[in-house]
A protein has these predicted regions:
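Disulfide-bonded cysteine-rich modules in secreted/extracellular proteins
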Residues: 23-29
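Structured beta-strand/turn binding interfaces of compact recognition modules in eukaryotic regulators
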Residues: 43, 93, 137, 146-150, ...
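Serine hydrolase/lipase
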Residues: 141, 186-211, 225-372
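Gly/Ala-rich beta-loop-alpha elbow adjacent to hydrolase catalytic centers
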Residues: 212-216, 220
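Extracellular Cys-Trp
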Residues: 31-62, 67
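A conserved cap/lid and substrate-binding interface adjacent to the catalytic center
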Residues: 99, 105-211, 229-237, 260-262, ...
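Cleavable N-terminal signal peptides of Sec/SRP-targeted secreted and luminal proteins
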Residues: 2-21
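Charged, compositionally biased non-catalytic regions
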Residues: 11, 35, 63-110
Length: 372
């Protein structure tokens, strides 16, 4: 009996594929995503309508597929190394609690960033702090939302223990690590969200650059998703670049983020330990457990600059490409603390000025002091 059913399915499958393809044969985005029978998706890379699961013929990743009419006007996002470097510097500024404006002035002088607010709050029972800031550049027509990474080894341990003992918390339509959500909400609800809303109201055409390193990148992910979900700014204006980001939430959160934030880039150094946290044993599970959102940009060994060898990771599993960072086994804290020759957590000690005389072991020293 079972063999008869299986044989019938095999015979019927090609016909079903043809029928499904028929409903996803529209020639424009609006008609494609408005299909009444199948959730077709439009790919701007080949300007064609595709059926769900058509991995072999659809050149777009999940993050690039368009399934909603409101996104048909979205431009196909591209990884921008120059913008990535700017975002990294802005992430490094977040570590400066005392003089962030001076760091902004020195790191990107021509942008003339104006600091709007800096928020620091205790984000766990051990008294560890989370921090973030909002700034604006009228020269670049950009609003910056940046979050600081962990500043002490005890905070990293608190995050690790929290991920093991505390269930994930609901966030929008998915679930995320409780520590990330708690830190984000304490900062966001204090004044960051209100400041962003005020700036967007005055400058509706400005892009919103959301960024962070390590713990800060997890909170930046939540911020970008929140901005898009609640329509605080047009989705096309929201840009996320993160550096050494841990897994923020589960598969549902990753899927929602990919659908909401089209211009999202998760920059990862080879051998960086933190993107492997929280741990995944075996193959990433789409039904339970932590799962990365897209799009990973993987820098190979000795990436001393933003233009070093790198590639966008479109392999399988989606967002957990087994040929990119998920394949790395020799993990390193130093590769986490240093991106593009910038010791992210301690760069503020130079007042965010690049110096040729910086010691080669500055990144390692940064880790020893807990600045990672």
């Amino acid at each position: 009996m079972f063999r008869h059913v299986l044989l019938g399915f095999v015979v019927f499958l090609p016909q079903l594929t043809v029928v499904v393809a028929f409903f996803c044969s529209d020639n424009n985005c609006e008609e494609c995503v408005n299909s009444h029978f199948i959730q077709c998706r439009w790919c701007k890379k080949d300007n064609k309508c595709h059926t769900p699961g058509a991995v072999a013929t659809n050149p777009c990743s999940r993050a690039e597929n368009i399934v909603e009419k409101s996104r048909c006007a979205d431009e196909l996002s591209r990884y921008d190394p120059e913008l990535s470097y700017k975002m990294l510097l802005l992430s490094a500024v977040a570590y400066d609690r005392l003089h962030p404006q001076e760091c902004l002035n020195n790191s990107l002088p021509s942008a003339r960033f104006q600091l709007q607010t800096v928020v620091t709050r205790k984000c766990d029972v051990f008294g560890n702090e989370c921090s973030g800031y909002v700034a604006v550049s009228h020269a670049l027509k950009a609003i910056v939302v940046a979050f600081r990474g962990s500043v002490k080894i005890w905070q990293v341990l608190a995050e690790f223990v929290d991920s093991l003992l505390t269930p994930e918390a609901t966030f929008l339509n998915g679930s995320v690590q409780t520590y990330w959500k708690r830190g984000f909400e304490k900062l966001w609800q204090s004044s960051m969200e209100a400041e962003v809303k005020a700036l967007v109201s005055k400058n509706p055409s400005y892009q919103i650059w959301v960024t962070g390193h390590s713990l800060g990148s997890a909170m930046a992910s939540l911020a970008s998703t929140w901005l898009a979900y609640y329509n605080i700014a047009p989705r096309k204006n929201i840009i996320l670049y993160t550096f050494g980001m841990p897994r923020v939430g589960n598969y549902k959160y990753a899927l929602q983020h990919d659908q909401l934030v089209n211009n999202s880039w998760r920059v990862v150094n080879d051998n960086d330990l933190i993107p492997h946290f929280p741990l995944v044993v075996g193959i990433p599970n789409v039904l339970a457990g932590p799962y990365h959102h897209g799009m990973e940009v993987f820098y190979s060994e000795n990436a001393v600059s933003v233009n070093s060898t790198h590639r966008e990771c479109h392999g399988k599993p989606y967002n957990e490409d087994a040929t990119c960072s998920f394949s790395e086994k020799r993990l390193s804290f130093e590769r986490h603390s240093n991106y593009f020759s910038i010791p992210v957590g301690s760069f503020y000690k130079t007042k965010c000025v690049r110096r040729s005389a910086l010691k080669k072991n500055e990144a390692t020293q940064s880790f020893k002091e807990g600045k990672w």
